[in-house]
């Protein structure tokens, strides 16, 4: 029986009766094991279903969000959050490499090494609710969105590890001349020293597993939307309102966010070439524009071709704002 969104939201996580073992999702997740093996790393992080992505302190494993276990739940996630984190193969592997970095840190107690702390900073530093990112900084790698490596020393390590682990990663050329290069070189040398070394921490505990979770999906999404669902007002709003519209007469027009999502690759590539700004920053600008278009309920003003042209012009200006902005605040 296919349940409506309203019916699904009334269920508790434990009512979903989802299983990872033997599933198609498990086979997709295990791709990370091959990447680790090719690097000579003996760790195989165990995985389990939970509310969200995380790798718990003290446990060298990876919690995987429940919605990836079923297409209908992925659809619900998209309806609620406008996106599915890890919902395609490339995004899934990027997240897994990041979480594998956390698992490596735990399994080999890396953060307790003096050299690690000298490179990445104090691991005991409190996690901020909001971190101040510097988009133009070259002291950090670019992997997940929102300059995530800048949020905390342990995230800096996990992001650096992820860039290093990626198959055919050309990090030596990409980051040549960046201070972040020294971090990658440190990770490369550290991982070479750990080749075929068994993990020190081998716990296989599942933290906050889905089967024990009695929270309803409605409560889960209410909290998640409150925390992540809104992009704050920004300098971009004036640009977006100039290109798109929220006039009642255009309610039947395509959503601006849908247009930007549809053409994101081609527009981002063109803008990166035109401005000379790195593709990572361009994609962050576009992602934020899409989020604000959703919040402001903006629509395409005229013909689709005109909308695409104006969107490209808008993104060029928005990238300029972001690239020259010394600090931008981001909610964790």
Q: Could you describe each region identified by the protein language model?
A:
Residues 1-3, 8-11, 157-331:
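Pan-zinc metallopeptidase signature
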Residues 46-48, 105:
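A structural signal for short, well-ordered beta-strand segments and their strand-loop junctions
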Residues 110-111, 122:
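A short linear boundary/processing microfeature
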């Amino acid at each position: 029986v296919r349940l409506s969104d309203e019916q699904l939201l009334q269920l508790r996580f434990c009512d979903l009766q989802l299983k990872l073992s033997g599933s198609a999702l498990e086979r997709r997740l295990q791709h990370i094991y091959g990447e680790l093996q090719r690097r000579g790393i003996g760790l195989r992080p165990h995985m389990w279903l939970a509310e969200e992505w995380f790798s718990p302190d003290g446990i060298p494993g990876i919690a995987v969000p429940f919605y990836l276990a079923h297409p209908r739940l992925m659809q619900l996630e998209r309806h609620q959050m406008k996106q599915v984190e890890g919902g395609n193969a490339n995004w899934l592997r990027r997240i897994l490499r990041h979480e594998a970095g956390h698992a490596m840190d735990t399994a080999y107690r890396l953060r307790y090494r003096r050299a690690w702390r000298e490179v990445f900073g104090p691991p005991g530093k409190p996690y901020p609710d909001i971190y101040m990112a510097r988009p133009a900084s070259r002291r950090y790698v670019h992997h997940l969105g929102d300059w995530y490596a800048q949020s905390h020393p342990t995230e800096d390590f996990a992001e650096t590890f992820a860039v290093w682990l990626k198959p055919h990663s050309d990090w030596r050329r990409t980051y040549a001349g960046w201070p972040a290069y020294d971090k990658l070189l440190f990770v490369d040398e550290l991982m070479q020293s750990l080749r075929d070394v068994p993990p020190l921490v081998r716990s296989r505990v599942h933290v906050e597993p889905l089967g024990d979770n009695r929270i309803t999906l409605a409560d889960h999404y209410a909290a998640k939307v409150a925390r992540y669902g809104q992009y704050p007002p920004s300098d971009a709003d004036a640009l977006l309102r100039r290109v798109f519209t929220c006039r009642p007469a255009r309610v039947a027009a395509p959503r601006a966010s849908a247009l930007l999502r549809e053409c994101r690759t081609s527009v981002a590539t063109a803008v990166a070439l035109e401005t000379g700004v790195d593709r990572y920053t361009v994609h962050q600008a576009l992602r934020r524009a899409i989020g604000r278009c959703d919040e402001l309920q903006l629509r395409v003003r005229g013909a689709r071709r005109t909308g695409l042209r104006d969107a490209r012009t808008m993104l060029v200006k928005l990238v300029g704002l972001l690239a020259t902005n010394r600090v931008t605040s981001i909610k964790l």
